[in-house]
Amino acid sequence: MRASKYHLNTLKEAPAEAEIASHQLMTRAGMIRKLAGGIYTYMPLGLKVIRKIEGIVREEMNAAGAIELLMPVVQPAELWMESGRWEQYGAELLRIKDRHQRDFVLQPTSEEVITDIARNEIQSYRQLPLNFYHIQTKFRDERRPRFGLMRGREFTMKDAYSFDRDEAGAQRSYDIMYAAYQRIFQRLGLEFRAVAADTGSIGGSRSHEFQVIADTGEDLIVYNPESDYAANIELAEAPALLATRAAPGQDLEAVPTPGAAKCEDVAKLLDLPLARTIKSIVLAVDQPEGPAQVWLLLLRGDHELNEIKAGKLPGLAGFRFATETEILDHFGCKPGYLGPIKTARPVHVVADRTVANMADFVCGANREDYHYQGANWARDLPEPELVADLRNVVEGDPSPDGKGALSIQRGIEVGHVFFLGTKYSEALKATFLDDNGKPAVLQMGCYGIGVTRIVGAAIEQNHDARGIIWPRAIAPYEVVICPVGWGKSETVRDTALALYEALRARGVDVMLDDRDSRPGVMFAEWELIGVPLRVTVGERGLNEGVVELQARREAEAAKVPVDQALAQTLAKLDLL
């Protein structure tokens, strides 16, 4: 491609609303243009990157035995009602009506449609296993779309769905997709981790996220550098109880703590480590009849509640945070001074594993401006009703596999695999005849990759002050040839054209910048766009018999003889 015949429109400044590097750089590089909140036009450069990602995904899915189809973006509401998600999905599900006032949705996902296909297409165990996939536009009506393609409303995903006759087969399909995802992200040239994850609202019993490592990532990834253990922060298990609890060493005492409503303030006021304090979190679970059940969750002052873990405890499914009225009714005190000793009304008490092992701790006294110091289980209050893992792990916690300490880094979720079991196939009555001629329910798995999200994630991981640094596999162009003096020197033109045609003949995706721009402007623009390798052809260099190769990731350019320019360019590309 020649730049003079292409659409390049880079910007010096990013829009004020662009908060993160990928949004800023994609806009400045002319890859996307905003149409509405969370909705973007993919300009030619951006679309090239997307198509390259799709190509790698498609190749690996096909190689893994998946079969491509294409499901519609607009789906009838009846299917969503049948699965129960018409009401469950919430405001992110964009509901529309046609001219006949029939309800439809713009698909945020395709479990209902693919299960409908399966129940109509799969009759016998002889047709199994099957794995269908598509690459399609999705729409989720995010409350606050932001970060460009990282959290948009309209986006492109690859969805795959496996169907098996039994759970053992479904687990094999899961493993095949897991391995395919490993290959996909390796080929994309991204640093990533596959981490165990919560299944969330989509359901199922086994799940892994594929996270691109980036300092700006919203997710926290917990891993053990000395083993294969890796999990999302929501799922990572905190250490179990120590063998014994220390004996009480202090008397219980109510001490004044005026204005100290946070554990940090209490610890500072009493000159104690924050780890000696206990924070009280009050939850409520609404009941079919009568008032809500009130629960008191206790965590160490320096730990944070993991709401996913809490929601999985017996009796706490569907919890909400208690209202101030409920708190006053059960504790006789406003938040900030709550504790498990002498509550006004009975509450269910759940202690984190760490808290259950504490002695001589500090907790709220259920009296404004007072805390208890020297509190001890059994002596001053009953043992907790339940001891559980309630907290997020922290850096340095022992690894659950017993092989060292945990580390934490940030990541961006770009892929997710789930074993669904029969959640959707039972709801939509997707059955087949087994080898005994009896009806059986299909076992399912689903596997998603955020195609457009990968674009943003790749930039978040690969950029510098000058612009994007694309991995070769997904760069809009692999090489850009920058002739200095295109309009003045026939030798420069001929040399640049010869190299351009030679690279094209060898299948290299190359751009020739024939716009006769000033060198500084031309170089800065291609550094912003992030092409992995630049070849500079100038009259001064040609007089010396050389051209310059500049890898985007490297500080220094290399001079190579003109007659070796093709070979050296190809060799350099192989190293990128």
UniProtKB/Swiss-Prot annotation:
Domain notes: Consists of three domains: the N-terminal catalytic domain, the editing domain and the C-terminal anticodon-binding domain.
Stored NCBIfam families: PRK09194.1, proS_fam_II
A GO biological-process term: prolyl-tRNA aminoacylation
EC number: 6.1.1.15
Membership in a protein family: Belongs to the class-II aminoacyl-tRNA synthetase family. ProS type 1 subfamily.
Source organism per UniProt: Bordetella bronchiseptica (strain ATCC BAA-588 / NCTC 13252 / RB50)
Functional description taken from the UniProt entry: Catalyzes the attachment of proline to tRNA(Pro) in a two-step reaction: proline is first activated by ATP to form Pro-AMP and then transferred to the acceptor end of tRNA(Pro). As ProRS can inadvertently accommodate and process non-cognate amino acids such as alanine and cysteine, to avoid such errors it has two additional distinct editing activities against alanine. One activity is designated as 'pretransfer' editing and involves the tRNA(Pro)-independent hydrolysis of activated Ala-AMP.
Keyword Flavoprotein: no
Compartments (UniProt record): Cytoplasm
Pfam families (UniProt xref): HGTP_anticodon, tRNA-synt_2b, tRNA_edit
Protein name as catalogued: Proline--tRNA ligase
Gene Ontology MF terms in the entry: aminoacyl-tRNA deacylase activity; ATP binding; proline-tRNA ligase activity
Catalytic reactions of this protein: tRNA(Pro) + L-proline + ATP = L-prolyl-tRNA(Pro) + AMP + diphosphate
Complex formation: Homodimer.
Gene3D superfamilies for this protein: Anticodon-binding domain (3.40.50.800), Bira Bifunctional Protein, Domain 2 (3.30.930.10), YbaK/aminoacyl-tRNA synthetase-associated domain (3.90.960.10)
HAMAP family noted in UniProt: Pro_tRNA_synth_type1
Keywords annotated in UniProt: Aminoacyl-tRNA synthetase, ATP-binding, Cytoplasm, Ligase, Nucleotide-binding, Protein biosynthesis
Primary subcellular site in the record, as a coarse category: cytoplasm
GO cellular component, one term: cytosol
Keyword Protein biosynthesis: yes
